[in-house]
Amino acid sequence: MNLIYNFSAGPAMIPRDVLNQAKKELHNWKNLGSSIMEISHRSEEFIQMALEAEKDLRDLLKIPDSFKVLFCQGGARGQFSAIPMNLLNNLQTADYINSGYWSNSAFMEAKKYCTPRSIFIRETNGVKESLLPMHKWNINENSAYIHYCPNETIDGLSIYEEPVFENKIIVGDFSSFILSRSINIKNYDLIYAGAQKNIGPAGITIIIIRKNIIGSSSKMTPSILDYKKISDHHSMFNTPPTFAWYLSGLVFKWLKKQGGLKAIEKLNKKKSDLLYKKIDNSDFYINKINSKHRSQMNVVFHLVNPKLNYIFLKEASKTGLNYLRGHSIVGGMRASLYNAMPLEGVESLVKFMSYFEKRYG
């Protein structure tokens, strides 16, 4: 079978080595005679796996003991509600840095629980879009927390500067950013991430939260979204998505074998640089994002002649380059280059783009 490269924004590719290991262990995990999908989440074997997964994640991100790691459900959208219910702490407002679709979605959900402020940071210089630097963010001193999204998958925008605001709780939606590069976890109080981009299959959500902000949830908070309840029950207040947890653990081990986040960050830059170079050196393709804020995870580009979009997608799919259609909000194309996307996949895409430009340009 020809190699298929999945450029979807999520669910995304999972490393081939991880899939092969999961396939090998599917019917008989740890010589138990059962699949991990079939055993109790309270069994000794599963708990050991869960502890290993957390340890590997802590090693990768250098998470100190002052943080809890929670494996939850509900995706990032679940956290859009959980965050205000857990962190407002009787205050009436929070600051939401608005850089695109997902940060705005979090803001809109927060309006159900408080009076949040949307701080719009996008600006256009000529034809290129960029983002205001953090020192120009108009932060409200009375806000309960600051929420931002370092990578907007739909818009192809990234904030690489890490937040430093004194006496403020910093919350980050890292769904498409986590494990793609090294970060200083101590600059944050809570980061959360849906798994289906850089971690594993859809169904599990990871929360990394500073211990001293757990325990201030409002009375209206459902137990399933209460960080203290989840923490006290070791992420097993209800039956967790066991297979997604297991696969995430395999991905963490795979990342460590690749050399950790420094090596992954270097490879991710190489992949995105290759694709952006192709776009920038062409009059056939265009990217409208300032180079300082271009996403390494989600490369958004347009054909100068949009009438060729359908043909581009159809011919790309025939060569094994799948799910390149851009989101309906922005149109065009989007190539998601998450950790599991090999360099060879990007090279194949660039080669196809050159062929397509030569034929139709």
From Swiss-Prot:
GO BP annotations listed: L-serine biosynthetic process; pyridoxine biosynthetic process
Top EC class, one word: transferase
Catalytic activity: O-phospho-L-serine + 2-oxoglutarate = 3-phosphooxypyruvate + L-glutamate; 4-(phosphooxy)-L-threonine + 2-oxoglutarate = (R)-3-hydroxy-2-oxo-4-phosphooxybutanoate + L-glutamate
Pfam family membership, one: Aminotran_5
Location in the cell: Cytoplasm
GO CC list: cytoplasm
Keyword terms: Amino-acid biosynthesis, Aminotransferase, Cytoplasm, Pyridoxal phosphate, Pyridoxine biosynthesis, Serine biosynthesis, Transferase
N6-(pyridoxal phosphate)lysine modification, residue list: K197
Entry's cofactor comment: Binds 1 pyridoxal phosphate per subunit.
The EC number(s) this enzyme carries: 2.6.1.52
GO molecular function terms listed in the Swiss-Prot or TrEMBL record: O-phospho-L-serine:2-oxoglutarate aminotransferase activity; pyridoxal phosphate binding
Annotated binding of L-glutamate, by residue: R42
Positions that bind pyridoxal 5'-phosphate: A76, R77, W102, T153, D173, Q196, N238, T239
UniProt pathway annotation: Amino-acid biosynthesis; L-serine biosynthesis; L-serine from 3-phospho-D-glycerate: step 2/3; Cofactor biosynthesis; pyridoxine 5'-phosphate biosynthesis; pyridoxine 5'-phosphate from D-erythrose 4-phosphate: step 3/5
Requisite cofactors: pyridoxal 5'-phosphate
Similarity-based family: Belongs to the class-V pyridoxal-phosphate-dependent aminotransferase family. SerC subfamily.
Assembly, per entry: Homodimer.
Function: Catalyzes the reversible conversion of 3-phosphohydroxypyruvate to phosphoserine and of 3-hydroxy-2-oxo-4-phosphonooxybutanoate to phosphohydroxythreonine.
Protein name: Phosphoserine aminotransferase
Organism: Buchnera aphidicola subsp. Acyrthosiphon pisum (strain Tuc7)
Native organism taxonomy: Bacteria, Pseudomonadati, Pseudomonadota, Gammaproteobacteria, Enterobacterales
Gene: serC
